[in-house]
């Protein structure tokens, strides 16, 4: 009997306690939702206030004033850039042109020392001659020899020495050379055309070869003597050129035919 009576009383007490806890929980959730709703409203109001402050409403007069200021600043910067470019162009036009052609070398009456001390114009033909004269990497010495020779040529001819040198090289430069090859266990020679640099190299080698057997002591004087001999058609370089061309004509039958 005691067990039967205690059990329903325990159940009623436990059920009443659960109902009380559930009511308290519901009340707390409602108050939390109401507080959350109010806090969300305050947050939205703050966001709207910040947006209004960061994005102020411009009236038409303010916008026009701002656009005018921007346009004036752009026009001023563009005008400054244009004036700067114009001043640069004027400075470039007013600069003196570099020494070219006949202005490269001084008059024949001037001294040789001043010409040797200053660097002469870089020309492919002159540099080729300097490189062929150079020994043991002493390029400054070779440049001094060539500059002295060119200054003497100018004094004797009264013309631009570089043009005189190029003309002399063009007169003695060959058009072809002989190349040897083996055919059927037999060495034959056949002509091959030369490029411009190859022709110039052979001509300069012939000039320097003739300078070895000349009488003047200085190499610059011997170069001048050989170039003047080429201008007067009395140099042995013409004989070398004619002999090479004659041998090329004799061996023209051995030239390979390429289809």
Curated annotation (Swiss-Prot):
Subcellular location: Mitochondrion
GO biological process: mitochondrial translation; ribosomal small subunit assembly; translation
UniProt key word Transmembrane helix: no
Signal sequence segment: none
SUPFAM superfamilies registered for this protein in UniProt: Ribosomal protein S7 (SSF47973)
GO molecular function: mRNA binding; rRNA binding; structural constituent of ribosome
Residue list for modification Phosphothreonine: 157
Range of the transit peptide: 1-39
Keyword Ribosomal protein part of the UniProt annotation: yes
Principal subcellular localization: mitochondrion
PANTHER family, per the entry: RIBOSOMAL PROTEIN S7
Name of this chain's protein: Small ribosomal subunit protein uS7m
């Amino acid at each position: 009997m005691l067990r039967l009576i205690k059990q329903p009383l325990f159940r009623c007490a436990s059920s009443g306690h659960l109902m009380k806890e559930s009511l308290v929980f519901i009340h707390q959730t409602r108050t939390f939702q109401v507080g959350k709703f109010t806090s969300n409203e305050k947050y939205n109001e703050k966001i709207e206030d910040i947006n209004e402050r960061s994005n102020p409403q411009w009236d038409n007069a303010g916008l026009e004033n701002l656009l005018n200021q921007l346009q004036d600043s752009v026009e001023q910067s563009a005008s400054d850039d244009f004036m700067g470019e114009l001043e640069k162009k004027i400075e470039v036009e007013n600069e003196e042109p570099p020494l070219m052609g006949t202005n490269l070398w001084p008059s024949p009456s001037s001294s040789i020392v001043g010409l040797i001390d200053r660097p002469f114009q870089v020309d492919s033909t002159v540099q080729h001659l300097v490189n062929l004269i150079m020994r043991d990497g002493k390029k400054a010495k070779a440049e001094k020899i060539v500059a002295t020779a060119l200054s003497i040529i100018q004094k004797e001819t009264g013309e631009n020495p570089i043009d005189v040198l190029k003309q002399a090289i063009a007169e003695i430069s060959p058009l072809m050379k002989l190349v040897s090859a083996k055919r059927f266990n037999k060495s034959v020679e056949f002509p091959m055309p030369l490029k411009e640099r190859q022709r110039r190299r052979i001509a300069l080698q012939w000039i320097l070869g003739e300078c070895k057997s000349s009488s003047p002591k200085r190499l610059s004087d011997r170069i001048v003597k050989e170039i003047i001999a080429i201008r007067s058609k009395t140099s042995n370089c013409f004989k070398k050129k004619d002999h090479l061309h004659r041998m090329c004509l004799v061996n023209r039958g051995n030239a390979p035919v390429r289809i």
